[in-house]
Amino acid sequence: VPDLYDDMLNTFSPKKNAAFEFCEAVYFLAYKDDKVVGRIAGIINHRANETWQKKEVRFGWIDFLDDIEISRALLDAVSEWGKSKGMDTIQGPLGFTDFDAEGMLIEGFDQLSTMATIYNYPYYPQHMEKLGFEKDADWVEYKIYVPDAIPDKHKRISDLIQRKFNLKIKKYTSGKKIAAEYGQAIFELMNEAYAPLYGFSALSQGQIDQYIKMYLPIVDLRMVTL
């Protein structure tokens, strides 16, 4: 599933992406015989580096033909840029934040990818290994089948927890109302819940405002419960 073109342009634009409050980036294309044969983004997330006490340059949005010289040239370009900025380690694929697609597919190439994940050909991780990169973390995707009826045990546990903690379920008919009443709280909760995740950096107020405006008014309310 390819990215939406306008979304990608907005992500790469300092005028459109609030992550540039604490990130800087550079973009490279690889050419061979006057044809584009690869691309890569280099990113320094200063907030993440401060949080995790590291000096890392990230690479993301990497694509290349099956030619080791192309992949080497792309990654060398980001490495050299990172060194010029005082970084001592390169990691990726990562984006500006955890809301960008991350990681590299190493199995499940026969499965349909989603817009929230990265698809790449099997030769991609092979190139990374040949270039001396090592896996540092695993992201695992699961397919969960929802039963036609809620199991009685799950229903009893749900009822018990709701009574014990006085929990109530709220459903909305307006994305704008969710944004107005709970938008700030939703993303503050995400900052707290996502804090232990690999390479996470807390969303700034500018990013929270941006995501509230981008996503909450258009969410599928059938999928949202508070």
Show where each model-derived region lies.
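A short helix-loop-beta-strand connector motif used in the catalytic cores of GNAT acetyltransferases and
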Residues: 14-29, 213-225
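Acyl-donor binding region in acyl/amide transferases
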Residues: 51-137
